Amino acid sequence: MVLYTTPFPNSCLSALHAVSWALIFPCYWLVDRLVASFIPTTYEKRQRADDPCYLQLFCTVLFTPVYLALLVAALPFAFLGFIFWSPLQSARRPYSYSRLEDKSPAGGAALLSEWKGTGAGKSFCFATANVCLLPDSLARLNNVFNTQARAKEIGQRIRNGAARPQIKIYIDSPTNTSISAASFSSLVSPQGSDGARAVPGSIKRTASVEYKGDGGRHPSDEAANGPASGEQADGSLEDSCIVRIGGEEGGRAQEADDPAPGSQARNGAGGTPKGQTPNHNQRDGDSGSLGSPSASRESLVKARAGQDSGGSGEPGSNSKLLYKTSVVKKAAARRRRHPDEAFDHEVSAFFPANLDFLCLQEVFDKRAAAKLKEQLHGYFEYILYDVGVYGCHGCCNFKCLNSGLFFASRYPVMDVAYHCYPNGCSFDALASKGALFLKVQVGSTPQDQRIVGYIACTHLHAPPEDSAIRCEQLDLLQDWLADFRKSTSSTSTANPEELVVFDVICGDLNFDNCSSDDKLEQQHSLFTRYKDPCRLGPGEEKPWAIGTLLDINGLYDEDVCTPDNLQKVLESEEGRREYLAFPTSKSPGAGQKGRKDLLKGNGRRIDYMLHAEEGLCPDWKAEVEEFSFITQLSGLTDHLPVAMRLMVSAGEEEA
């Protein structure tokens, strides 16, 4: 299948569209700014608390007539542009595909050659998040603002979180708690160049945006600094290190056994990555607040590159650190922190290391999507953005916004399909909400069979009273997915050209598994075909599952304005009741604060990550290895991202 790299089939239509949008944009921007000036966020209200009341009134009286005058002047040009823009949308393609070719060991071509489908299985990590990148006036309804700056910041945090090396540390002694269990996959144990020194007892902590792994290097950084000298082909991000720590000497770590050569992790140049938001000034002790892009100081260990590697220590140098992989017995290596669960689960201050696939919702603003794409291309080679339709299409209502879906992948994308839900109503009908279906290649067998997986990203109808509409959309989602798999599958069943190893659905479904008003969606047949790792049954959640929708009134409270603070708050029941959104009752009663004291559960979980156990290649299975709720985007969106790591292996292989 040919992937569309431009929204229009020829340059003539593209130029005409650019001219028409240039005529519309001033009017669009003025309306957005005018409305936004009357919708302050709680953060802005606190900033203005000490200002005299007359100052705000003076600014409003002064600038409102100016905006209105400019708006009236821009209206004729906007009308002229709309006359050309609207019919052009019938020729517009439903997405734009971008590839920034990466020839490094972490690039897509190199990743395909790593796994042949033989021997041990392979894990794939998926993440989904609603990032609320709407036009600023609409974003303020969710108590977030400055969409363009947030887009840069979100991309930067995701990139730096995913680019960390995947390190797992197991502590033998229950009394040795010197290493936080808050982020079991985000600890780095630096070793000397000889690879024979013990893991240091003291650890230097750092913010996630300060860490730049090789996979997280921005394209412009590589152009400025040049490639790192002496890079080896085996230093990919897929390398992981398992460090086993004993508790015989208190907080002192034991020396790792039997170093495995070639297990490396790379640390890029220090300092702040390119693309940092200009109005975010980093300060000591400030981790992830609105005044700093720092995302956390609790769970990530920063290696001192120049000290042990013998490098020059210059800011532009890319030093490499050797990580000694201890030989751990298979039973010990697979030991889980939660014996009562088949997989590890946590509230993490970071996106998972070695993130393979990212699905985002509510990336509605085109300029924000471009900034987000620029940041994420430093880690993800393949990106689909500006997904959706505009104008009038078929029997659908007029669409002012696209679907808001955004997809990024480290693996090559083979096929893509998009469908718009035709039954949207109310304000949701103005956006072309739908489903994006993707087929990705993750490897090839020695017999040249492609190893592939299917991913569906969606965003369902939002108004809480429209359960029937969401159920219809879930029906359409299943039908479209079945058609997509049928149209993109290999023709021969006896000798297939492809092996399907995973089938994942993720996105914001706008209903939870604890509200009595959402019973219709909770019992949908989708949950019989796809497994929800957080769910026991209709209306019944697993005890460790928490809500993913934050209470927007508390987004900028000091207790939750940094990833680390939000992580700590969500690990306590009192904190969850204070800062997560809970089901709203249609019956009259107490207010939000008083009602929460009577509620049970852990909040509204409306962001889902589902995987299929059936429909995969015979003798293959996909099992959840890790599941995490992520706080790294605190202060930037009103949702918690979620991530899932699937272990794919042949059925006959024993764990």
Swiss-Prot record:
Which EC number(s) does the record attach to this protein?
3.1.4.12
One function term, GO molecular function aspect: phosphatidic acid binding
Query: Per its UniProt entry, which superkingdom is the organism in?
Result: Eukaryota
Cofactor entry: Mg(2+)
Q: Where in the cell is it found?
A: Golgi apparatus membrane; Cell membrane
Q: Which residues lie on this side of the membrane: Cytoplasmic?
A: 1-10, 32-64, 86-655
Protein name stated in the entry: Sphingomyelin phosphodiesterase 3
Organism, by scientific name, is Rattus norvegicus (Rat)
Lineage of source species: Eukaryota, Metazoa, Chordata, Craniata, Vertebrata
